[in-house]
Amino acid sequence: MEDSQRGNASMMSMMDDPFVVSPEGARDPPSTNQYSTFDAQLFNLDASTPAQAKRALEAHLAETERRLEEASKLGTALVEQRKDLEDKLREVEQQQEEGQIGEELRRKLADLEREYNEIGQETARAFLAPKRLAGGDDGHLGTPSMDQKSPLHSALFAGQATNSPSKVSVPSRKSRNQSNRVHDIEFATEISTSLLAQVRQLQSLLAEREETLKTVNLEKSRLELEAEGYAQRIRALDESEERYKDENWALETKIHELMAAVKDVTDRETKLTSSLGAATAEKSAMERELEDLKQANAKLIEDHTAAQKANDAEINTLRRNLSAGDAERLTLQRKLEDMNTQNQELAKAVAMRLRQQEAESTREVVRPHDSEDEEQATPENSPPPSPNKFTPRHNHLETETLRSSLGHAHRMIQNLRSTIHREKTEKIELKRMLQEARDEVEQRRRDSVAANGPTNKRQKTKAETRKPARPDLLGAGRKKAEVEIHDSDWESNAGDISPTHKASNDSRDRRGDQPIDDRSDAYHTATEADDPFETANERETTTESEAFQTGVESMAGDSTDSDELTETEDRVQRTPRGRVSSMTLAKARDRTSYYSTASTSADEGDSTDPGTPSISQFSTPRYRLRKKRSVLRKIRPSGEAPMAFNSRPSSARESPSTSFTRDTSAAPEGQSLFAELAEVDGDEDDFGPPMQFEAASPSTPRMLPGFDSRRPSAVTVELPSKPDMVDSGVMTDPWEPNLHLASQTDDETVISVPVTPDKPTMSDASTGMDVVESPSLVHSSTQWTPLKPNAETSDDHVLSVPTPPKMAWDGQTLNEERKVDIPDSPTTQRELNISSVSFEETEPVAPSFPELRTAFFVGSTTEPVAAPVPVPPEVALSPISSQTTQPTEPVIPAPPEPEPIYVPEMAFSQILVEDTLPILAKLPEPAPERVFAEQGTSTDIAELSVSAISSEQTEPVEPVYEPKQDVAIVAEAVPEGPLSFVEQGTNTDDVEISFPAISSVETEPVAPVRETKDDVPEPVLSLTEQGTSTDTVEFSVSSISSEETEPVEPIREAKEEAAAVDDVASESTHPVLSIFLTPPAYTEPTAPKLQEAVIPPAPQLALSTVSSVETPPVQYTPDVLILPTPPALDENTPPSVMASTAKATKSAPPLVVVDDNTDKGTADGLVTQQNGVTLPLGAISGNAAPRRARSGSSNQADQGAQTILSSKQIDQLLIDRASVRPLSPPDSDKLNEMSNSPFATPKARSRPVPQASNASLHKRPGSAASQASSVQIHPPLPADHKEAIMAAEKKSIDQRPASAGLMGPPLAPASAVRASSQQRPRTPNESALQVGSAKTTTSRASVRRDSHMSRRSSVSSFASELEERFNMQPNPPFAPQGYSTGTDPRMIQAITQTMIGEFLWKYTRRAVSGEISNTRHRRYFWVHPYTRTLYWSEHDPQSAGKSEGRTKSVSIEAVRVVADDNPYPPGLHCKSLEVVSPGRRIRFTATTSQRHETWFNALSYLLVRNGPEDEEAENGVTLDDIDEFNPGFRSRSRQTARMSVSSSQSRGTRGLPKQRSGSAMSLRPSVTPGRASPYPPSHYSDQARQASSSRLSTIFNSTIKGSFGRKGPYAASSLNEDSIHNHDDSVEDLRHMMDRGDDVDRLENVRACCDGKHDVSSLSRTSRYSPRANRIHSHH
């Protein structure tokens, strides 16, 4: 056994011997293990930080050193032992002879030697480097050599035995004699063996100890890491647990609310289903009844129509026959009388001649026949001739004359008879054709109506659209409707008689002149006599038309009672089928009107204006026209009918071209030919009714009631010189076309007068054409609706007659007719210049009236087809048709090319380019990097004296800055860049050049923005949507107007040098604040971290980069915000940065920022001067210059300026940041969290519980930025302040009246009840919590304009404010009857009015989605104040019966004001009220701003007043009351001002800020015991949903601060709407004036636009292309 052990030991020694290497070299020398092995496990435990790796390496190094130390100690001990053993061996060798060593002893010695060697080898292997190995290169490096000096040589024991245990040696005598030494040797050997065993044991123990220690250390480090991870997880889980607990409570509350809402909805659904069933049944019954009525009505209508047609036809026939017979009889009687008279004269003349001849024959004196005395008249001085005295007579001439006259009379009688007969035939034929055409059209109309469906059919049966009776079929009044059919062959001289110029007129007039009947084959159904009817060129070639009447004759269709006809009978409403009398197609005063076969000067009075519809022809006295050469002095413009201007459709009158005709005076309509001729001549002996010159008005045409009621053309034409005229009354005079000078000029000159372009819309008459006279027959259906004339013919009685709209076919001919009319005459050109002014797109369509019966003109589309109209080159009307857009073009100057060279007008050109280039060029010192947020940051030039930021109102306040005090505000949103301030750039010498970098895209190019005093070509303000432009001092307005960069609360980082810029107070002249423009891409401005970049002092730069994006300017207010320039510290800000920031903050001067809030002139953004308190969320205007604080109220932030980021960007940011952050913020971060900058992106609070008390006690910051350093500013709180606050909160929570439908809230903060305000996305001002209830900084004592209370929130002032707000008097003497003591008596009147109710315009709901539509209907609204219920019905319930209509109602949960740009129906207020109720929204609009305010005030007050259900809590201070007096955290229900105008003024308050996103809401406190509101008690429903979702989403990123789910707590609407007076005309204007007066000593608001109406900061934060961006302020 011992041998085997020795063998094993030897084998182990061979294996483990470091000096022995196998010949194959399979083992490498363990040189790498000189030190302790590297513990890879230690580094596998998430050595994610350099510090952890460093700790691992240090541990490894210490371990290695320890092991080296222990190895050295062991080696030393072993060497000493070896020396001792060698000494003893020598002694043994010396004493060998003295004692005999036995085999056993020798064996032990050999074993001891072997073990010694093994120990030495192991020791050497463990502690010695390989280089210390002995041996040569022969491959036996480790084997014992024969060297005697080798410690491994067996000869070491030579003194005790032979060289080899196997060597046979004879012991010396001395050894043998000294046998007693053997025992000593054995003893020594045993000792050595035991020692070696102990050494080996100790070595093994040491190795085990080392292994154990290493394992323990590794385990310890691993456990430490795990413990740290577990601690973080536990901390996170604790936070999540609290959040989940609150969330669960909130969700449970919501579940109950939703269950109640579902129950309500189910009930409503049941009711609605039943209502729907009833309505459906009612509807079906009504439809059946309606169908029955329709059928019955249709049958009756058809019967009636048939009967009426038959009656009309019969009556027409009878009247026609009667009138024809009467006219023929009268005519023949007149002719007979004429003939008798002529015959009597002739007989007298013959008898006289016979007597003379007899007398001559009785005389004996015979005169020679050739005597000249026959040719001489009796001398004047001769005595009167005696009967027997011979007086020379021209008997022959008289005889010939009488014979000629008699022949002419016979011929005339024959012609008239043939004409009468012929026209009778033609009229009968035409009437038949017309009747057939009407029948066919009626049939077609019925067919088309039937095809169109029941809607059109039903509409057709309405009274206003029913086909009117046609008086033209009744016989008497048809004389001007008659179509004269001219047969060119019936009279041989027709061709000679017709004026030659009429052919051209016909060619032009073809479209308008020809009756519609001739246009379509459909109307030639039964006529075989097409040839006898007029052809295109025959119109004025014949003499049968009434133009040739002499007054004693009457046309066949004329009746004796024509003078008694009423206007309706005469000017009948005709369908387009009525043929136009050819007389209407003749030019006014055409030669043909005088060319009568038997006219005498006495008969010419009857020649009426051929173009007039004969109303005046038969009604005006027939004066004898006094022939003058001046009669034709003025000729009616071509195509101008007497009624044309005023009777044209309103659509034409409203067109821009009407300006051509408006300023010309014209004779009134309806004048006779005499009147019009007299009007032209103007002599005192002219005939006709007096002229009344009425300016043509664009209103619907007015007709004078009498027969003279037609108004001549409104255009007075400038004609060529008066043509020479001769008396043309005698038939025998040769027709001289030259006398009628206008005959040729009618086409060229007269026609060139600007015809009112509107008239082309008349399709059937020639009015739109170049006929110089008034149109023939005007179809009332297309032109005007004639009214019955009054008996008197006074021209003063004017009726407004609606004109029908343009017909479908009118549009087809419109262009052609217009082309003909417009010449290039100077008059026309002068008139055309106005067209650009008429850029008004007055849509003439709107005035169309229902009376226009366009349905009847089915067939009239064919009319324009026939004769092509030659278009004269003068035609210039086409631009009029496109007038609507053309005027804009002339107005727009050619846009100057945007060049970097400064062009004052160009404000847009360089916006795009502006982005970064100007900054680089201007950087004076490269030291601090400028981060240009992709686009906006403009490097400001230091010398820009104006706070170049929107220098709009920059009253240059002299900057008192020290150059080192530049405060740089960097939005964290641009993470990469060191402070991107233009501040450094400001030192650049280009003093005046204010960067276009503010490139605000919408900056109105109004004023050339900057004057570059240097030649530096400043890029013209590039209006890139965001930059606030730094303007030089002079340009107060310039580019800022549209700058949409709404500085999202830029956090100003104060350099340590940032000195008290306070002195700059009143001077905002600090040069360009280059606003760090983040591009519209919303670089997310999460709380900007302080950058330590050293900025070269720019003496005047106050704050440079305000990172703001896209704030379309809304009303500008010059308010100044004084910011203490707090550093924006994130939770993760390193301590060193925090320290430097704190120091910088103390030294940094407050920034004075122009307030950007919309409605308040001064109050909103400003800080009260004493305390510097500022609107926590108010956007910092880029021009803010540090300056002395000025007293002003601080605004609550109603909408976060942080809303620049979209939700996707925010989520991405959070994900990116989550990976880098520690899971839980260190405790030191809580301090940062408490003092987070108001401008930092709001962070979702990770643990609500520790700050539970703070939730309800949010402090009002001492100044806009004081929140960042609130911990340092305020006096220390007592050590147990949190416990005290928690106890107080708990007490107040317990005292709240319990809601019956809600579960008991958790003992956590009231956030569970109020939709957990802790977790909802916060406005920046919420990020700073004040710990402690005694917020008694002196700076808070200034007046609070927002909440109408002082800013002090101590217990006493809080109580007094409660008394003031809620009228809490300990023992109120009385309360208004019917109202609780909490009712503001000033609101009772408004509430009473709403109780009584009125008609408002309610938006309907879409049938499918139930969303609010764009249409409104009128409903009667009233309110029940106690139940807070809004009722409405179709009728006034006071006057309507019980059966009339149903009343609907909703419970009023909240009311908001929304901007409303819906133009229909016109005349309503520009804002609507939206009442939020469980499950739906009701939106309605008041008629005036006063009514709007009354309703909004009353509804708001009802929601916020103390109702009976919560009166018991009135005198108790609850968490809601505490929140009430913390401006940023008032409960939503009280977020709107409750005071009437008088009360708000009496308390010296300012108006609340105007809405930012387009709506304002009042919310009712949901403490009604029996109702579980589906909306969170103090939040909008949509916000509650988003807030809860954001809470859920952020629970998983619990330690990531800065997540917020929406763009601001009130993104839906600004609750600080100027509640009681939010319309433009209200008291706010006065406040604006007062505030402006207060602000004269302050900075100009360089971010204002629109003359101060808007301010960039308060504009919508959404993208400029989002639908809501321009709701409130459609800027530019």
Swiss-Prot record:
Molecular function in Gene Ontology: phospholipid binding; tubulin binding
Main location: membrane
GO cellular component: cell cortex; plasma membrane
Top-level lineage group: Eukaryota
A Pfam family: Mcp5_PH
Disulfide bonds, paired cysteine numbers: none
Compositional bias per record (Low complexity), positions renumbered to this chain: 163-172, 593-602, 1032-1042
The keyword Coiled coil is assigned to this record: yes
GO annotation, biological process: conidium formation; maintenance of protein location in cell cortex; microtubule cytoskeleton organization; nuclear migration; nucleus localization
Role, per record: Required for nuclear positioning and completion of asexual development.
Protein name as it appears in the record: Anucleate primary sterigmata protein A
Native organism: Emericella nidulans (strain FGSC A4 / ATCC 38163 / CBS 112.46 / NRRL 194 / M139)
Gene: apsA
